C-alpha cells in the first residue's frame, strides 16, 4: 500500500542528498554544454507521472497488452504534434534516445555490413555516424567526410567524391560539433546520384528547425532523427520522423524500433515529449530560439575580440567550437579550469587535432541552457569575458575565485526554476 506522502528524503537519505546537490549545482553553475538544457516543470510533471507504470508494447491501437486506451491517447498526441512541428508525414516517438533512433534507421535501411558515409567525429560528427567505436562503425563499413580546411564548411566536394567512389547505401547528415548551416538539398542530390538513402540526424538543431530558424531537412531526407532534449528542451529521448511518403520505409522504421531494437516504450517519457512538442509549437518558443542564436553570436564576438580562434570563423546555430591549439591549452585543462569557476563546458576535438579525444585541443560551447534561464546578450558577453579571463591565465587562483563569485551572483539573478 502506498501513500502520497512517501518520499525519498526519509527512505533513502544518501540518494536524496546526491539529488539535492545536483539541484544546487544546476542552479549555481552556468551550463554551456551545447547538448544540455532545462526542461519545463510541465515536462518534469509528465516524467514523474503514473504513466511509468504502464507497459504498452506495440503502437497506438495495436498493442500487445490491455489497458492501453489512455496511453494510446498520450502517444498519439506526441506523434501528431511531432509531425506538425517539423512538417512530417510520419513520426515514431518511442526511441529511448537519439542513438537508439539512429540504430533503428541503420537497421531499417542498411544491410548488415553495408557501406555508410557520415561526418567524421574529429570534424564534428557523432559517434553513431560511423565512428569505429560505435555500432555504426563496427557493424557497418563506414567512410567519413569532413570540413574544408580553408572555409571551415562541410567539404561537399569531398563528400561527393567519397560517395561516388564507395557507393554507400546511406549518406548521413548532421553533427554534434559543427557551427555552420548544412546544405541538405545538396546532400540529397549527392545521395540520389549514387542511389543512397539520405538520413539526417538533426539532434543539435531540432529546436532551431522547429522555430523556422535553421533549414528543415525533412523535405530533403528519406529519414530524420533527433533527440528531444538539447535545443528542443524536452525530456531525454529520441524521435524518428519522415516526409518521404514511402509507407514501406515507415513500416521498416516501426519494425526496427519495435520489436527490432526495443520492447515496451516509456510512456511517461512519451507523455513528456508530447508536452515539449506543444511548448515548441508556441510563439514563445520561437522567441527563445532567436535569443539562443543572438547569444551564440555575442559569445563569438567576445572570443574573437579577445584573440581566440573559433572553428569555421563563427557560428550560425546554437554552438561554437573554440580552437585552443595556438594558445597551447588542452581542452581537458580548459574544461577543468572553467569547471572550478562553476562554468560547465566540455572538451572537444577540433579539426586536425594533434591531441587524443581524451585530452583534445578545443572546447564546445552552447547557449541553449543559459538562454533558457534568461541570460541575454549583456549577460552572455560578460560571461564570455570571464571565460577569456580564466583561459588567459589558467592557473591564476585569484581570477578563478573572482569568476566563481561573479558566476554565483549572476546565477542568483537568473534562477533556473523560480520559487
From Swiss-Prot:
Domain of life of the source: Bacteria
EC number: 2.1.2.1
Record keywords: Amino-acid biosynthesis, Cytoplasm, One-carbon metabolism, Pyridoxal phosphate, Transferase
Cofactor: pyridoxal 5'-phosphate
Site (Plays an important role in substrate specificity): 229
Record-listed N6-(pyridoxal phosphate)lysine modification sites: 230
Membrane-spanning ranges: none
Binding site for (6S)-5,6,7,8-tetrahydrofolate: 121, 125-127, 356-358
UniProt keyword Amino-acid biosynthesis, yes or no: yes
Subcellular localization: Cytoplasm
Annotated Gene3D superfamilies: Aspartate Aminotransferase, domain 1, Type I PLP-dependent aspartate aminotransferase-like (Major domain)
BP terms from Gene Ontology: glycine biosynthetic process from serine; tetrahydrofolate interconversion
Cited Pfam families: SHMT
GO cellular-component term (any): cytosol
Assembly notes: Homodimer.
Family: Belongs to the SHMT family.
Known role: Catalyzes the reversible interconversion of serine and glycine with tetrahydrofolate (THF) serving as the one-carbon carrier. This reaction serves as the major source of one-carbon groups required for the biosynthesis of purines, thymidylate, methionine, and other important biomolecules. Also exhibits THF-independent aldolase activity toward beta-hydroxyamino acids, producing glycine and aldehydes, via a retro-aldol mechanism.
Name of the protein in question: Serine hydroxymethyltransferase 1
Organism name: Colwellia psychrerythraea (strain 34H / ATCC BAA-681) (Vibrio psychroerythus)
Amino acid at each position: 500500500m502506498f501513500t502520497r506522502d512517501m518520499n525519498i528524503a526519509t527512505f533513502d537519505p544518501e540518494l536524496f542528498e546526491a539529488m539535492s546537490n545536483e539541484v544546487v549545482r544546476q542552479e549555481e553553475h552556468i551550463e554551456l554544454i551545447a547538448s544540455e538544457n532545462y526542461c519545463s516543470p510541465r515536462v518534469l510533471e509528465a516524467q514523474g507521472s503514473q504513466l511509468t507504470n504502464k507497459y504498452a508494447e506495440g503502437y497506438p491501437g495495436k498493442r500487445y497488452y490491455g489497458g492501453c486506451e489512455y496511453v494510446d491517447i498520450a502517444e498519439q498526441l506526441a506523434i501528431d504534434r511531432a509531425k506538425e512541428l517539423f512538417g512530417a508525414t510520419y513520426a515514431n516517438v518511442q526511441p529511448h534516445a537519439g542513438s537508439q533512433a539512429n540504430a533503428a534507421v541503420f537497421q531499417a535501411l542498411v544491410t548488415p555490413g553495408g557501406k555508410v558515409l557520415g561526418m567524421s567525429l574529429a570534424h564534428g560528427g557523432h559517434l553513431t555516424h560511423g565512428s569505429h567505436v560505435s555500432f555504426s562503425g563496427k557493424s557497418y563499413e563506414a567512410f567519413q567526410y569532413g570540413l574544408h580546411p580553408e572555409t571551415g564548411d562541410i567539404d561537399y566536394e569531398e563528400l561527393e567524391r567519397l560517395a561516388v567512389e564507395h557507393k554507400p547505401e546511406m549518406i548521413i547528415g548532421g553533427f554534434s560539433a559543427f557551427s555552420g548551416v548544412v546544405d541538405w538539398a545538396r546532400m540529397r542530390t549527392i545521395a540520389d546520384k549514387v542511389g543512397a538513402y539520405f538520413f539526417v540526424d538533426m539532434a543539435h538543431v531540432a529546436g532551431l528547425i522547429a522555430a523556422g530558424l535553421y533549414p528543415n531537412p525533412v523535405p530533403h531526407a528519406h529519414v530524420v532523427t533527433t533527440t528531444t532534449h538539447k535545443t528542443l528542451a524536452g525530456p531525454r529521448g529520441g524521435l524518428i520522423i519522415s516526409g518521404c511518403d514511402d509507407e514501406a520505409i515507415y513500416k521498416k522504421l516501426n519494425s526496427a524500433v519495435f520489436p527490432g531494437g526495443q520492447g515496451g516504450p516509456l510512456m511517461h517519457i512519451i507523455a513528456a515529449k508530447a508536452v515539449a512538442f506543444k511548448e515548441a509549437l508556441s510563439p514563445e518558443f520561437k522567441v527563445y530560439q532567436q535569443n539562443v542564436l543572438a547569444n551564440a553570436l555575442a559569445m563569438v564576438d567576445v572570443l574573437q575580440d579577445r584573440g581566440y580562434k573559433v572553428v569555421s570563423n563563427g557560428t550560425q546555430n546554437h554552438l561554437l567550437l573554440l580552437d585552443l591549439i595556438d594558445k597551447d591549452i588542452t581542452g581537458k585543462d580548459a574544461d577543468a579550469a572553467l569547471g572550478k569557476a562553476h562554468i560547465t563546458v566540455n572538451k572537444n576535438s577540433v579539426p586536425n587535432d594533434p591531441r587524443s579525444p581524451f585530452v583534445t585541443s578545443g572546447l564546445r560551447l552552447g547557449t541553449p541552457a543559459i538562454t533558457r534561464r534568461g541570460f541575454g546578450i549583456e549577460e552572455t558577453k560578460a560571461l564570455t569575458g570571464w571565460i577569456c579571463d580564466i583561459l588567459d591565465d589558467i592557473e591564476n587562483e585569484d581570477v578563478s575565485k573572482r569568476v566563481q563569485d561573479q558566476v554565483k551572483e549572476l546565477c542568483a539573478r537568473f534562477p533556473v526554476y523560480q520559487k
